[in-house]
């Protein structure tokens, strides 16, 4: 699994949660 991509997805998810 690509770590970088995983971190990018995680960061996007956290931002999405913050907005809600």
Curated annotation (Swiss-Prot):
Q: Which GO terms describe its cellular component?
A: cell envelope
Q: Which gene encodes it?
A: pepT
EC nos: 3.4.11.4
Family of this protein: Belongs to the peptidase M20B family.
Q: Catalyzes what?
A: Release of the N-terminal residue from a tripeptide
Provide the alphabetized UniProt keywords: Aminopeptidase, Cobalt, Hydrolase, Metal-binding, Metalloprotease, Protease, Zinc
Q: What is its main location?
A: other
Question: Biological process GO annotation list?
Answer: proteolysis
- Requisite cofactors: Zn(2+); Co(2+)
**MF GO annotations:** metal ion binding; metallopeptidase activity; tripeptide aminopeptidase activity
- Co-factor binding details: Binds 2 Zn(2+) or Co(2+) ions per subunit.
Subcellular location, record wording? Cell envelope
- Please state how the activity of this protein depends on pH: Optimum pH is 7.5-8.
Q: How is its activity regulated?
A: Inhibited by the chelating agents EDTA and 1,10-phenanthroline, by bestatin and amastatin, p-hydroxymercuribenzoate and some divalent cations at high concentration.
Q: Which residues form the signal peptide?
A: none
Q: What is this protein called?
A: Peptidase T
Q: Does the keyword Zinc apply?
A: yes
What does the UniProt record say this protein does? Cleaves a wide range of dipeptides and tripeptides, but does not display activity against larger peptides. May have a role in the survival of F.nucleatum in the subgingival environment of the mouth.
The source's domain of life comes to Bacteria
């Amino acid at each position: 699994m690509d770590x970088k991509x995983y971190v990018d997805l995680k960061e996007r998810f956290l931002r999405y949660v913050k907005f809600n």
